[in-house]
């Protein structure tokens, strides 16, 4: 469920960032680079963006050739994490159905001369199969957390968020910090996850007077994975918190432009555009033709909305947390977001809307 929620919230960030859905098309992943997890994540996000008027509004002619890696390469990164977890699951299922006792007793063993010959002291108890896949998952967790934090950072940074307010707060005098501390928090958690990703399985310390001279430390690895997965959920919750704010701004900005265009003639609309040429300039006529075309297009456009699953997830967020129009205490809201992730409420809302 945590992986599916990561895909859903990545889709919300794509909407807020004005990213494209074309990199999520199934033929790119199933046909050309068919890693199973990659195809699943791409399909999850493409479905979450279905029906998005925001995505459709800038599909052509926005001048963006390639999105940043944290948007364009989500299926490849999320998918690799999925495949790591899938491998761990395969090993766990084998272990759950395996015999790991010691010694092992084989009554009637062919060639056995006595009862002692029917008893084999083997090594099925050794935890290395589990330890190594836990190390694999430990390495994957900060990878997923890191790309989530990078998307969050893009949404709050005015240099990269494509016109959204700095730190997603509407003041222009710089007196409010908005979602700045949310990014600080995510960065701190990601750093902590990265420092804990070092594999315990590569450090064997002999026990039992060297009778057990090579051990897996698998229990430590499993405990680390449990704790780290909880912190990964916190990073995903912080991205949801931020992406919901960004998406509200994005919707309002696009719809405000539509309303502005429908309520003004071309000359009035042109007067509100920074850097517009004067009436005596040589390129004024061409500029006005472009303004008229823009006005007509915006005036006829329907209200811009995100994809249906993303919109449902956003509505679920808003049932618990209001849009932030001014700085306020955020600790309680962050905890509510963590609880929403833990209980899977946003994912259930999104799936019901598909």
Describe the residue ranges of each PLM region:
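C-terminal auxiliary extensions adjacent to catalytic cores
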Residues: 1-354
């Amino acid at each position: 469920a945590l992986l599916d929620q990561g895909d859903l919230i990545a889709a919300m960030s794509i909407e807020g960032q004005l990213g494209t859905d074309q990199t999520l098309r199934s033929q790119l992943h199933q046909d050309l680079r068919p890693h199973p997890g990659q195809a699943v994540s791409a399909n999850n996000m493409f479905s979450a963006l279905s029906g998005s008027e925001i995505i459709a509004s800038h599909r052509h002619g926005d001048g963006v050739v390639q999105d940043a890696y944290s948007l364009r390469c989500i299926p490849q990164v999320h998918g690799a994490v999925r495949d790591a977890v899938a491998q761990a699951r395969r090993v766990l299922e084998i272990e759950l159905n395996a015999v790991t006792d010691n010694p092992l007793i084989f009554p009637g063993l062919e060639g056995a001369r006595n009862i002692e010959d029917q008893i084999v002291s083997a090594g099925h108890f050794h935890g290395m199969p589990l330890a190594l896949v836990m190390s694999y998952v430990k390495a994957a967790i900060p990878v997923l957390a890191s790309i989530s934090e990078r998307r969050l950072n893009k949404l709050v940074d005015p240099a990269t968020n494509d016109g959204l307010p700095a730190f997603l707060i509407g003041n222009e005098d710089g007196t409010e910090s908005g979602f700045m501390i949310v990014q600080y928090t995510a960065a701190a958690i990601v750093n902590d996850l990265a420092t804990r990703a070092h594999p315990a399985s590569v450090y064997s310390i002999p026990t039992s007077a060297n009778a057990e001279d090579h051990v897996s430390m698998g229990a430590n690895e499993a405990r680390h994975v449990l704790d780290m997965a909880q912190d990964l959920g916190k990073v995903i919750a912080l991205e949801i918190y931020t992406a919901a704010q960004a998406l509200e701004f994005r919707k309002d900005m696009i719809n405000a432009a539509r309303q502005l265009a429908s309520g003004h003639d071309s000359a009035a609309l042109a007067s509100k555009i920074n850097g517009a040429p004067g009436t005596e300039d040589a390129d004024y006529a061409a500029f006005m033709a472009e303004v008229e075309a823009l006005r007509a297009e915006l005036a006829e456009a329907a209200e811009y909305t995100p994809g249906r699953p993303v919109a449902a997830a956003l509505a679920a967020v808003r049932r618990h947390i209001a849009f932030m129009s001014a700085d306020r205490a955020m600790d309680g809201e962050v905890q509510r977001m963590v609880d929403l992730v833990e209980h899977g409420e946003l994912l259930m809302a999104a799936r019901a809307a598909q």
